[in-house]
Amino acid sequence: MLLWILLLETSLCFAAGNVTGDVCKEKICSCNEIEGDLHVDCEKKGFTSLQRFTAPTSQFYHLFLHGNSLTRLFPNEFANFYNAVSLHMENNGLHEIVPGAFLGLQLVKRLHINNNKIKSFRKQTFLGLDDLEYLQADFNLLRDIDPGAFQDLNKLEVLILNDNLISTLPANVFQYVPITHLDLRGNRLKTLPYEEVLEQIPGIAEILLEDNPWDCTCDLLSLKEWLENIPKNALIGRVVCEAPTRLQGKDLNETTEQDLCPLKNRVDSSLPAPPAQEETFAPGPLPTPFKTNGQEDHATPGSAPNGGTKIPGNWQIKIRPTAAIATGSSRNKPLANSLPCPGGCSCDHIPGSGLKMNCNNRNVSSLADLKPKLSNVQELFLRDNKIHSIRKSHFVDYKNLILLDLGNNNIATVENNTFKNLLDLRWLYMDSNYLDTLSREKFAGLQNLEYLNVEYNAIQLILPGTFNAMPKLRILILNNNLLRSLPVDVFAGVSLSKLSLHNNYFMYLPVAGVLDQLTSIIQIDLHGNPWECSCTIVPFKQWAERLGSEVLMSDLKCETPVNFFRKDFMLLSNDEICPQLYARISPTLTSHSKNSTGLAETGTHSNSYLDTSRVSISVLVPGLLLVFVTSAFTVVGMLVFILRNRKRSKRRDANSSASEINSLQTVCDSSYWHNGPYNADGAHRVYDCGSHSLSD
């Protein structure tokens, strides 16, 4: 019987492994034409592998695989999807890409592998993606990038790596890669060298470097000079110093060489100086250090992803580009659309999109004072002004905003539904103001917001459901406020990847209903709070231990009790922190519980993001099949056993009847009964033995 079970399981697994199904013909996925393009939508289908499936071979299509369980990609994983022109793999829990996984996808131009758990890009990770122009890998756990990771991507122009754990970029990582748009926000970069890194992206049109712990020392001098020499408006956002302390919070472009390098009186002689104005070339095509087959020998401006025009690539190969010269009279010059810029502000075109309006430090006291109103503003900077309140009416004419900076004002009042018209807003800065309460109504309408910075306010209260209005929020900066507690379910409905709560007044943070909702967290900063190292903090400590040092940014020091003052409670054992609890537990249980994932007494919930007890489906399916087959054979065996028992019972009944007849025959033969017919009227009932035979 066991042999039959094994044979059946093997045959079924073999058959299942060789069946190839068309995801469109068999209606496994939703396949629809949208604006002439076929979209193959396989969202949340539970796929763990794609080698058993195929897609239409007669036309090109966009392949959507987000929300599945493709945790590992093996070589030739997409061999049956060779007509795909874009690939979306967000939210798959993907943690490993084996080199060769993308072989066959030579037509793919856009690859989205964001919101996964990828830790490294190895050499030849992207082998096979010959035509790739756009790579999005933000919100991963990316730490290590091999110098040859992008060497096969000779057409890559847009590289999005924000919100990872990158602390350094290797030399020659961008060699022969024609990068024009680079996003490195929200990583752990302290410096970016010019040689062998920045010098290899001469065609840069847009770069984002915010939210990195920049170390503003001599090593950052080359980055500062490079930023000053790239095209105007190429830098999006700010580069803010994290260290040294004397420069903390200062914008890099506001520093001087003396600030960065006090002991050095001149620029590092190893860096090539930018050419003098008279040495610059006249506008025209120049050779670039990268070429592909069939590509002409000129700069590659190309087309921006959104359909706009990129800045022309007038770059030199071995020297940094010359800074664009902006005259004072051009700042308030009428724009191409003949709309003047509000007085005191400067307006610039964003390549391929709308306007960037800079009203920083212009003594603006109200947004109503900004006249005329420009409807196509996408980035509005109002930092360092005297604004006291903001109201819904202020943003009626700014429906296209993507970035809004209201930092370092005097804002204490935000009218409910103020941002309701800003449906496209992605970045909101309200740091260094006087906000004291956050509520859902204040942020209504911000359905696409990804970044919210409200540090350095006076926030004491966050009402329940505040962040539900921002379902796409990924980065939340709440440090340096007056917070003492967080409401239950405060993070329900959002998938935060980075959270800053340092320098508040938290004595402990509950796990259940608060921290256990941070299932997508990749970086959290909690230092500078007055932690009370007593029994109540044990669940929080165990949660922090499960995160590990890669996610937890800094040490957590006790404020009370006195014997633990300024000690990192992560280095203390649970029985030291809570001796009265562990004194009740046997030594065996105590030693076991030190490494456990939670205490039943404290109601700590395990974090599903770190749950390693899940069974792989490749093990689960054969196991269930074996159980099913075994159960079937067991049922059949029981039926056979029951039928055999019935036959034996019938035989016993037949033998018993024969014995009774023989006994009756014996009695008749002894003439105990009178011969003759049955006489009902007699004193005795008499049977006619002669009328019966054994055959009856």
UniProtKB/Swiss-Prot annotation:
Residues 18-622 are extracellular. Keywords: Glycoprotein, Leucine-rich repeat, Membrane, Phosphoprotein, Repeat, Secreted, Signal, Synapse, Transmembrane, Transmembrane helix. GO terms for biological process: adult behavior; axonogenesis; endocytosis; gene expression; homeostatic process; multicellular organism growth; neuron projection extension; norepinephrine metabolic process. PROSITE patterns: LRR. Expressed predominantly in the frontal lobe of the cerebral cortex of the brain. Also expressed in some astrocytic brain tumors such as astrocytomas, oligodendrogliomas, glioblastomas, gangliogliomas and primitive neuroectodermal tumors. Its main location: membrane. Residues 212-263, 529-580 form the LRRCT domain. The chain crosses the membrane at residues 623-643. Changing V85M: Does not affect surface expression. Pfam families: LRR_8 (PF13855). Residues 1-17 form the signal peptide. Residues 265-314 are annotated as: Disordered. Residues 18-57, 332-373 form the LRRNT domain. SMART domains: LRR_TYP, LRRCT. LRR repeats lie at residues 59-80, 83-104, 106-128, 131-152, 155-176, 178-199, 376-397, 400-421, 424-445, 448-469, 472-493, 495-516. The keyword Cell division does not apply. It is linked to Trichotillomania: A neuropsychiatric disorder characterized by chronic, repetitive, or compulsive hair pulling resulting in noticeable hair loss. Affected individuals may develop physical complications and often have overlapping psychological disorders, such as Gilles de la Tourette syndrome or obsessive-compulsive disorder. Belongs to the SLITRK family. It is involved in synaptogenesis and promotes excitatory synapse differentiation. Enhances neuronal dendrite outgrowth. This is SLIT and NTRK-like protein 1. It comes from Homo sapiens. The lineage of its organism: Eukaryota, Metazoa, Chordata, Craniata, Vertebrata.
